[in-house]
Amino acid sequence: SFLKENDRLLTTVVQPAYATLSEGLYSLETSGSAGQTSSISQASPGGIIDTSGALPKGLALLPDGKTYYHHLLFAETGSSRSEKELVQMLLVQFQKEQSAIRNLASQSPSLITLLSEENTAVFPLAEPEEMLSDLQARMKNDFPVSSPVPTVTVKDVVPSLEPYSAPAFYLTTPLGDSDNNVIYINRRNSPQGLELYTTLAHEGFPGHLYQTVYSNRIFSDMHTDPARKLIWYGGYLEGWALYVEFLSYDYAATLLEQAGQPDAAQVARLEKHTRSLQLCMYTLLDLLIHGEGAGYDQVAEVLGKFGIDSPGTCEAIYTYI
C-alpha cells in the first residue's frame, strides 16, 4: 500500500508540480508579467536564457548579480575566500599541473601521442562490479575499513531518464540502511575503461558511497545531533569525491602496471593532471563570467592562451559555463 501511495503521489502531485514550475519560470524568463519586460531581460539582452539566438550573459550583469554570485559561491563551496583569492589559488594549481605534465612528457615523449590518438591498451577491468571490487581492495591501505563492509548493486538508468541523467551516480541510502547501496550507470553516455574506473571511484569507493556510509555510522556511534544530517556541506561532499577521484588515477596506474601495461599506466598519470588542469580552467572561467562579467570575447581570449582557438569550441565552453 505504501508503494502504491508513493506512485500515486509521484504521478498526480510531484510530476505536475514540476511541470507547472518549469512552465512558470520559462514564462517569467522570456516575457515578464503584465506586458512588462522582466528584470532579467532588462539587465542584459535576453537575460541568462536568450531566445533571440544571442549568447547568454553571466550573473554579474544582472541586477545585484555580483552580490548574488558571491553568496552562491560561499553557499556551494563553504569557503569564505574572496573571488580574487580563489583565482590566485587556481592559477597556482594550474601552474603545478602544467609542470607535472611537462615532466611526464619529458620522461615519456610518446605519451602525448598515445593520449591524443586514444591509442592506449585495453583497460584490465571491463565491468563496473569488477572496478568497484578493485577500488575497495586498493583503498584499504589509505582509508579505515567500514564494518560491516557495505554492499553495492550496480543498476542501469531506465531508458526514459537516460537523456537527463549523469553518466553514473550514487543514490544516497536511507539513514537506517547503510548496508545496501546502489550506483546507477547511464548506458547511453557511460564512460568506459579508465574514465569509468575513476567515475566509480568518485561515486562509490572511496567516494560518495564510502563517504556517506562511513559518516553516517560514525555520527551514529558518537550520538551526534541528528540536525547535522539536515545541513548541506556541498564543498566538503564534492571536494572529497574529487580528491579520491584524483587518487583513483594512481590506483589505475598501479593496476595497469600490474597488468603489464607500463605505457598505459603513464597515460593514466597524465590523464590525472589534464583532468585537474581542465577543472582549474573551467573554474577560472566561471569566476570571470559570473563574478566579473566577462563576455564571450574575453573568454575566447583567455582560452586562446590555453591553446584553444576554435570559435566553435570557445562558444561551446562559454555557453556551457
Task: Name each region found by the language model.
Residues 1-321:
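N-terminal maturation segment of proteins
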